[in-house]
Amino acid sequence: MRFYIGLMAALMLTSILRTDSASVDQTGAEGGLALIERVIRQRDAADVKPVARTNEGPGRDPAPCCQHPIETCCRR
């Protein structure tokens, strides 16, 4: 009887491990693509050059504005 219980436990454990390893492979591939996309977005954001504001003058903040197409606010 103990042999059959041990055998069933071993079979259940192997099936669980196979399922986990398959899901790791799938998420690993998707995670790799997400990582590449994130690195490309960070690189593109780093390529943005700040430009001077056109409304510089007394009482104005001369900080450069960010001209990124996604961001509309100025960085300070």
Curated annotation (Swiss-Prot):
Residues 23-42 form a propeptide. Contains 2 disulfide bonds that can be either 'C1-C3, C2-C4' or 'C1-C4, C2-C3', since these disulfide connectivities have been observed for conotoxins with cysteine framework V (for examples, see AC P0DQQ7 and AC P81755). Transmembrane segments: none annotated. It comes from the Eukaryota. Expressed by the venom duct. The keyword Nucleotide-binding does not apply. One of its GO terms (cellular component) is extracellular region. Probable neurotoxin with unknown target. Possibly targets ion channels. This is Conotoxin Cal5a L1. It comes from Californiconus californicus. The lineage of its organism: Eukaryota, Metazoa, Spiralia, Lophotrochozoa, Mollusca.
